[in-house]
Amino acid sequence: METESSLVNIGPSEFIDSFTLMDARLETGIKMRFAIGGNGPALMLVHGHPHTHIIWRKVAPLLAQKYTVVLPDLRGYGDTDKPESTPDHRPYSKKEMAKDLISLMKLLNRPTFAFVGHDRGARVGHRLALDYPESVTKAVFVDIAPTATMYALTNKEFATKYFWWFFLIQPEPFPEKLIGFDPDYFLHHHIDGQIKIKGCVEDKAFNEYLRCYKDPRTIHAICEDYRAAATIDLDDDKEDADKKIQCPLYLLWGARGTVGKLYDVVGTWKEKAVTVSGEALDCGHSPEEECPSGFLEKVLAFLD
């Protein structure tokens, strides 16, 4: 059921200079928190797990010198709504998340835009580019191989390094209760295990991630995101197996991270997109936090 759309100004961002926080009531029924700043062509940047839109705090101000930069919190994450799920996990499918993003850009009167997604955000971006090829002009995916590919090639090393892919998909409330017992520990373990440049996540940023993560509704929503990835998202991908991303796709990944070590990243995406290029940066899973200068250099060169 569609809902009347609206925008509410929350005030200046505490984390990203010259950006404004806003809430958008989308036609999908979701109230989405996002930050916006800058002028120029539209550019959307979407976080992954276990983050929120503030993961872009080191790169967004410079991108905003050339673009109107939109930084949403995905449904289930941050200060965006966490809708009730269903047995098939459809509300947390990448298809539904992509609808939210298109609805937001429609509300902002930005029918076309470039897209940068990290982690789960890039998985939403994959679906976004397939379902709305007329809207996405260019795409950057950060530190992922395709979901179906990663599941199909699962081995001991991947299952050990990315254990949460298999932990979070267990039936509720098993993972929810275990994480909820000590979300601070779980979040520290997760982030510290993926970054390779220590100190890149300031205490203030970590505490903001934790503020959101310790909400039981967030924990459940995150589990549903992963449950969807292991079920209905794979069904959607299988149904669209003959479709490819039409816009130019650029890939960045951390040379010291799991994805870069286990996969031919560009090769995996050549099966999914028409035009693919990419390269590694000397970091772990989160280039935008670990090596923002290198990230900006590569992304701006591609977008320009």
Put a short name on every predicted segment.
Residues 283-296:
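Catalytic histidine-centered segment of alpha/beta-hydrolase-like enzymes
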Residues 45-48, 71:
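Structural cue for short, hydrophobic secondary-structure segments
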Residues 50-58, 69:
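Serine-hydrolase catalytic-loop signature spanning alpha/beta hydrolases and amidase-signature enzymes
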Residues 2-25, 32-35, 39-42, 70, ...:
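Flexible "cap/lid" subdomain of the alpha/beta-hydrolase fold that forms the substrate-access gate
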Residues 40, 48-51:
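Active-site glycine-rich loops that stabilize anionic/oxyanionic intermediates
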Residues 54-57, 220, 297:
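Alpha-helical elements of the RecA-like P-loop NTPase motor core of helicases
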Residues 58-67, 107:
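A short, Lys/Arg-enriched amphipathic alpha-helix followed by its capping loop at the start of a domain
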